[in-house]
């Protein structure tokens, strides 16, 4: 996984 909840992907 390379994304976070509520945060921008990356």
Curated annotation (Swiss-Prot):
Residues where Glycine amide is found: 10
Annotated compartments: Secreted
Protein's UniProt keywords contain Secreted: yes
Keywords: Amidation, Hormone, Pyrrolidone carboxylic acid, Secreted
Modified residues (Pyrrolidone carboxylic acid): 1
Pfam family membership, one: GnRH
A GO term from the CC aspect: extracellular region
Family: Belongs to the GnRH family.
Designated name of the protein: Gonadoliberin-1
Native species: Alligator mississippiensis (American alligator)
């Amino acid at each position: 996984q390379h994304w976070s909840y509520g945060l921008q992907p990356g």
